[in-house]
């Protein structure tokens, strides 16, 4: 073995085959920050690789379709061009594809694709967003193309998002420049759509059903059909659908009254249908890609998800999960690190929550449509006569007979009553299981036995999950008053209401106890200040 010795003062370092001690001992271990940066780099490279492959496959697929169409025009019928019917079908498909796209310009350079997606998502499901990037500055060029699943979503976005303030700039929203060649077909589709009294409804709450939407909208007239588009995989609706009325006036009233109406915490987007009725189909593969590309994308996504899970478990408690994380996880990151989620439809006329990396940028949207709906026809409430059991007739007079749940489920409601019932349905899903007891004890009365005593007493009304005794100082002064609030969480809401009914107003140690329902969301977020 060849060796060499380098003398440095009194010390010497022996080299073997040109390798020093550092090579023999190995590199020092990576710090947590370096490990995080490495994981980010790996995941970013994987994401870019997948995006590049999908773009190439999409382009190849589109070119293949164009080639097939051209070949069909030459070969079909021994050299004859496509038949008029086939040619018209192809033209309509191209026109529909163009109608689904909108151009978005004057985008602030700090805003990314996620911000654009979340700002435009309330109008309908987005198939793709195409942003052009400058390879030198590594920033987008200030414009993008948003492609929706249905033309009506693009039409609503065009009507309601043009000149909206986004990131400190008034964005420009319009049709793509190539719409001119398809304009005659688009006009023809619009003319056909006028023969049907259809409206498009988007931003529908996930917990609402077709019947719920129908009951709300039938206040404006008789409905022929009401269908929400379904995801064939999950079976859940995708947040949009179409309603067809018998009369044109009904559809006009519904659009003018229900656009931007708050239904279940989400503001509906309602507009006239711009295409004739077609089946609410979902492409079998995302974005119309060939099956191989869809499978590859799904596999790659699963791989990335697995990497995130492994990386998150390795650095739990010390590091935030790198890369694409859920909005809840981004709360752990420093302010300004990533854009926050955009709730584009939190209030009529306002888009809130858009926070680019720097600086903080307000996002506002001018008021559109009617915020407080004016009913075109007075709401009606008709109850179907329930079947009465013999025992009920004997026990209760007709005026005092209780309504059974099965009877309530068959009520026929419409108009404002329908909207109220739908809102109540959504609120029931969030009923609180937490009771707060006020004015029960003084701070000096708190001891180790108090929690057990409260648990035992409240256990008479149901299963108690936990008891929290909270002392709240009423000011910054040293001698500020301290009040005691006792929070009791039951297993179900009915037990909470039973306890409140029994304990509210009861006297305890010379004090009149106040028992109330406490907001579940506040309690879950450890906010005991209300």
Swiss-Prot record:
GO cellular component, one term: nucleus
GO molecular function, one term: DNA binding
Entries under InterPro entries matching the protein: Nucleotide-bd_a/b_plait_sf (IPR012677), PUF60-like (IPR006532), PUF60_regulator (IPR051974), PUF60_RRM1 (IPR034209), PUF60_RRM2 (IPR034211), PUF60_RRM3 (IPR034212), RBD_domain_sf (IPR035979), RRM_dom (IPR000504)
Entry superkingdom: Eukaryota
Region (Inhibits transcriptional repression, interaction with ERCC3 and apoptosis induction): 48-530
Bias-annotated ranges (Basic and acidic residues): 398-408
Record's function text: DNA- and RNA-binding protein, involved in several nuclear processes such as pre-mRNA splicing, apoptosis and transcription regulation. In association with FUBP1 regulates MYC transcription at the P2 promoter through the core-TFIIH basal transcription factor. Acts as a transcriptional repressor through the core-TFIIH basal transcription factor. Represses FUBP1-induced transcriptional activation but not basal transcription. Decreases ERCC3 helicase activity. Is also involved in pre-mRNA splicing.
Cross-referenced PANTHER family: POLY(U)-BINDING-SPLICING FACTOR PUF60, POLY(U)-BINDING-SPLICING FACTOR PUF60-B-RELATED
Domain comment, as recorded: The third RNA recognition motif, called PUMP domain, is atypical and may rather mediate homodimerization and/or protein-protein interactions.
Stated family: Belongs to the RRM half pint family.
Protein name: Poly(U)-binding-splicing factor PUF60
Organism: Bos taurus (Bovine)
